[in-house]
């Protein structure tokens, strides 16, 4: 297994990522139902949020619908997807989350189906970025496995790993506490991928 994110960076920034963006209109209502559930688990609605790997902006759009006044920012590696995401908020940075430097913090920092595409060796950097970008909440919605487990993705290797992402972060950062967690199913009335989600909260 290659241990650098370089190959993945090139794939997601290039045609592979362009193709993904074309497949990503998504079910708007299902996304709104998902994020309504996430927000309900928080002690208060966040006033700002940053998404790493925001794609075409589906998740940011759902948050904007539910919280019209929320300040939003996204980081997206694929330029074609980022251009579409700017229809939701102009604050979209083109680049990998692994090189993102948090200048300001946001009440909510999150990923949804993104950490699974980062090689396990690079996850500590991704966790650090999420942690530093968050002022209060971190949400991860990813494919879970007790340890990093590679899965073939669209006929490709070195592109997807299930893992214990939230647990890794809880072990790494002692001021993070598990606020809530759950599962969404592809067979729900408002279906998503079969994803586990966790909400972590920074506490003194």
Protein language model annotation of sequence segments:
Residues 1-104, 121-132, 136-204:
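Class I (Rossmann-like) S-adenosyl-L-methionine-dependent methyltransferase catalytic domain
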Residues 107:
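Conserved active-site beta-strand-loop modules that form the wall/rim of enzyme catalytic pockets
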Residues 110:
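A conserved beta-strand element that flanks and buttresses the S-adenosyl-L-methionine
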Residues 113:
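Nucleotide-sugar donor-binding/catalytic module of glycosyltransferases
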Residues 116-118:
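A short His-aromatic
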């Amino acid at each position: 297994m290659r241990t650098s994110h370089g190959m993945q960076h090139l794939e997601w920034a290039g045609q592979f990522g362009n193709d993904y963006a074309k497949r990503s209109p998504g079910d708007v209502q299902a996304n709104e139902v998902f994020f309504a559930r996430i927000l309900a688990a928080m002690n208060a609605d966040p006033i700002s949020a940053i998404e790493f790997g925001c794609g075409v902006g589906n998740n940011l759009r759902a948050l904007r619908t539910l919280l019209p006044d929320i300040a939003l920012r996204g980081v997206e590696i694929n330029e074609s997807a980022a251009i579409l995401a700017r229809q939701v908020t102009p604050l979209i940075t083109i680049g990998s989350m692994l090189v993102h430097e948090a200048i300001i913090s946001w009440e909510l920092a999150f990923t949804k189906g993104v950490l699974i595409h980062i090689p396990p060796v690079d996850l500590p950097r991704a966790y650090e970025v999420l942690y530093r970008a968050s002022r209060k909440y971190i949400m991860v919605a990813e494919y879970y496995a007790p340890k990093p487990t590679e899965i073939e993705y669209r006929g490709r290797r070195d592109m997807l790993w299930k893992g214990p992402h939230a647990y890794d972060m809880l072990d790494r950062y002692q001021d993070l506490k598990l606020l809530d967690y759950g599962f969404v199913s592809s067979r729900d009335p408002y279906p998503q991928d079969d994803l586990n989600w966790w909400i972590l909260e920074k506490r003194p």
